[in-house]
Amino acid sequence: MDPNTVSSFQVDCFLWHVRKRFADQELGDAPFLDRLRRDQKSLRGRGNTLGLDIETATRAGKQIVERILEEESDEALKMPASRYLTDMTLEEMSRDWFMLMPKQKVAGSLCIKMDQAIMDKTIILKANFSVIFDRLETLILLRAFTEEGAIVGEISPLPSLPGHTGEDVKNAIDVLIGGLEWNDNTVRVSETIQRFAWRNSDEDGRLPLPPNQKRKMARTIESEV
């Protein structure tokens, strides 16, 4: 069993115990109490799956938390602020663009648009988004540009469906790349997106071959066989 899985469960059990003590003093509001009940059911399920006793795990979690607090300074207790990262200029973000052969897909709370008329181009993906804990927090806008600067694709949050995860954004990027590569375009992803929003790397930390290169390699292998 992964030690991180065990220690995470232990800490969650102890933190639930602290929240329960807080609620016992009639200090919690309705949403707090509702989350407490839901998390209790979740912990029981995780305990059964892991084969761990909740009371024993709570004691172990207390030791972990106490050890962390002993090493913690008041400065470290501050909530980290979000950072806003920008690949695009204000002009690139606000520029209107048009599609000759429009294709649009909604994935969760994200809208993916691309121009299917674009072929045999080198395309770069750029994005503006906020980051917290070194992970994407909120996507503001992602756009696909040709080397000439024309906009040929876009991923944007839907105002009517707020809220998206880093995994949602990564999946949307995969859809956009797949659609653009279908017409033999070469798609590159900015370093900022690779680092925070699209951590699609193999075991050696290298970005994998894009789908069109994989298809070309497969055809080459088949012809050799």
From Swiss-Prot:
UniProt region (PABPN1-binding), positions on chain: 218-225
InterPro entries for this protein: NS1, NS1A, NS1A_effect_dom-like_sf, uS15_NS1_RNA-bd_sf
Single biological process term from Gene Ontology: symbiont-mediated suppression of host type I interferon-mediated signaling pathway
Keyword rRNA-binding: no
Record motif Nuclear localization signal, residues: 34-38
Short sequence motif Nuclear export signal: positions: 132-141
GO MF term (any one): RNA binding
Region annotation RNA-binding and homodimerization: where it falls in the sequence: 1-73
Record's GO cellular component terms: host cell cytoplasm; host cell nucleus
Primary localisation category: host cell
Keyword tags: Eukaryotic host gene expression shutoff by virus, Host cytoplasm, Host gene expression shutoff by virus, Host mRNA suppression by virus, Host nucleus, Host-virus interaction, Inhibition of host innate immune response by virus, Inhibition of host interferon signaling pathway by virus, Inhibition of host PKR by virus, Inhibition of host pre-mRNA processing by virus, Inhibition of host RIG-I by virus, Inhibition of host RLR pathway by virus, Interferon antiviral system evasion, RNA-binding, Ubl conjugation, Viral immunoevasion
CPSF4-binding, as annotated region: 175-210
Location relative to the cell: Host nucleus; Host cytoplasm
Region (Disordered): 204-225
Record PTM text: Upon interferon induction, ISGylated via host HERC5; this results in the impairment of NS1 interaction with RNA targets due to its inability to form homodimers and to interact with host EIF2AK2/PKR.
SUPFAM superfamilies listed in its UniProt record: Ns1 effector domain-like, S15/NS1 RNA-binding domain
UniProt record similarity statement: Belongs to the influenza A viruses NS1 family.
Subunit structure and binding partners: Homodimer. Interacts with host TRIM25 (via coiled coil); this interaction specifically inhibits TRIM25 multimerization and TRIM25-mediated RIGI CARD ubiquitination. Interacts with human EIF2AK2/PKR, CPSF4, IVNS1ABP and PABPN1.
Domain writeup: The dsRNA-binding region is required for suppression of RNA silencing.
Function: Inhibits post-transcriptional processing of cellular pre-mRNA, by binding and inhibiting two cellular proteins that are required for the 3'-end processing of cellular pre-mRNAs: the 30 kDa cleavage and polyadenylation specificity factor/CPSF4 and the poly(A)-binding protein 2/PABPN1. In turn, unprocessed 3' end pre-mRNAs accumulate in the host nucleus and are no longer exported to the cytoplasm. Cellular protein synthesis is thereby shut off very early after virus infection.
Protein name: Non-structural protein 1
